[in-house]
Regions:
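Conserved metal-phosphate-binding beta-hairpin within the catalytic cores
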Residues: 266-302
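Glycine-rich phosphate/pyrophosphate-binding beta-alpha loops
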Residues: 235-239, 243-247, 294-308
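Flexible, glycine/charged-enriched surface loops at secondary-structure junctions
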Residues: 201, 274-276, 325-330
Length: 402
């Protein structure tokens, strides 16, 4: 069946592949994706027209890529999604410059920059009564003569991620969990010594392993009303230096109070498009603490589609078909994983194993990278090879669970 839209995704990772799979499952369409390198889960896929483009996240390059596809399909609407933080501001900057047949479901640049800057986001959380970890904002030049209002362990992370990664150094991490104040001072010196200029976020470490984490994925319509909310209970994350915090295993769950609070926030700021919140349950006071908002679908987004709520369909019905839609807050249990089962059982606490096995026996589980309709043999073999490597990655980065 011919459709009047073309999906255009920017990026090359599992986020892109998961959304491309959602589009293919819902509409049978091939997705165009631009990535920087001839590698990753999109490269060689039968469901993706994968195009390599140098400096793919540069705003001018993004404009060129989007314009080319819009001209290639002049009678269709081009749905543009950025599948990484590095693409979001490039898209937002170009919203007024995109061709008329381009649909980019994003908020304006000013609001986006407020939300993705952690210091400004936490100020909004305080205004809306959204709990977050106890926080100290460190500004360049403060030196070591300051007091933290909470004991260790401590978390150190950049307030602004994009420019942080523009200044690499050997021990660079997405976030640091540190035991002593001396370690905090040393990491601060390393980060600013590499050339980073913005603020750092120093936080109270919320105790608990990966299984205390939650992810909340949402879709807000063009009218600013939330149409879909799905909470994922994270059972395991990745622990490599650059992958730390990436979800590896999730079971969907129902958290109505958390969803209601976040829905009110999203609708009040008139958010549109996909969003996801990283959250951790604090067993000390029984509260969910929000870490950050991403103004996009996360790399684990298929946990929502796999549970029966196809993200591509929500987007198309809103922005292309202009259909009304009532809010759906998901309730069913479903297992999502991107690592082999053996690795999952080795590193996830045993108290979750029974439900994991039950969901697998019921067929209520998915690994988004294994899609029957994607028949390219070489692509499948590369995915299998990468799955095998997870055993070594976890063995070198964390201890097995009890």
């Amino acid at each position: 069946m011919e459709h009047n839209f073309v999906p255009l995704l920017l990026g090359a990772d599992i986020n892109v592949y998961s959304m491309a799979r959602a589009f293919h499952e819902a509409y049978g369409v091939e997705t165009i994706a631009y990535g920087m390198y001839p590698s990753g889960p999109c490269y060689g896929s039968d469901i993706i027209d994968y195009r390599v483009r140098e400096n793919n996240d540069d705003p001018e390059v993004v404009l060129r890529s989007v314009t080319e596809v819009a001209q290639e399909f002049p009678t269709k609407q081009v749905l543009v999604l950025g599948c990484g933080d590095n693409y979001l501001t490039a898209i937002a900057e170009n919203l007024p410059r995109f061709p008329a047949n381009v649909v980019a479901p994003y908020i304006d640049l000013q609001l986006m920059e407020t939300l993705i800057h952690k210091e400004k986001f936490y100020e909004l959380c305080d205004r809306y009564g959204i709990d977050h970890p106890a926080t100290f904002v460190y500004k360049k030049g403060m030196g070591h003569d300051f007091e933290l209002p909470f004991p260790g362990p401590f978390v150190v992370k950049p307030a602004e991620s994009a420019t942080y990664w523009d200044h690499p150094f050997d021990t660079q991490k997405k976030a640091y969990v540190l035991q002593t104040r001396q370690e905090v001072d040393a990491v601060i010196d390393q980060i600013y010594g590499a050339g980073y200029e913005d603020a750092l976020i120093l936080q109270d470490f919320i105790p608990g392993d990966d299984s205390y984490m939650r992810v909340v994925t949402n879709y807000s319509g063009e009218d600013g009303k939330v149409r879909l909310m799905c909470v994922g209970h994270v059972l395991l994350e990745e622990h490599t230096r650059h992958g730390i915090g990436n979800h590896a295993v999730i079971i969907t769950e129902d958290e109505p109070a958390l969803c209601e609070q976040l829905r009110n926030f999203l609708e009040d700021i008139k958010f549109t498009g996909f969003s996801n919140f990283d959250v951790k349950f604090d067993q000390r006071d029984g509260k969910f603490k929000v870490f950050e908002i991403n103004c996009r679908q996360g790399r684990s987004n298929y946990y929502v589609t796999g549970a029966g709520y196809n993200l591509a369909r929500y987007l198309v019905e809103d922005r292309i078909e202009h259909k009304p839609c009532q809010l759906t807050v998901t309730k069913n249990r479903h297992l999502w994983r991107v690592i082999p089962a053996k690795v999952a059982y080795d590193y996830i606490p045993s108290r979750y194993h029974a439900e994991m096995r039950a969901l697998i026996e019921q067929g209520a589980w998915v690994n988004p990278l294994f899609y029957r309709a994607d028949r390219n043999l070489i692509h499948k073999l590369r995915i299998l090879r990468d799955q095998w490597r997870y055993k070594e990655r976890y063995a070198s980065s964390m201890e097995k669970a009890n």
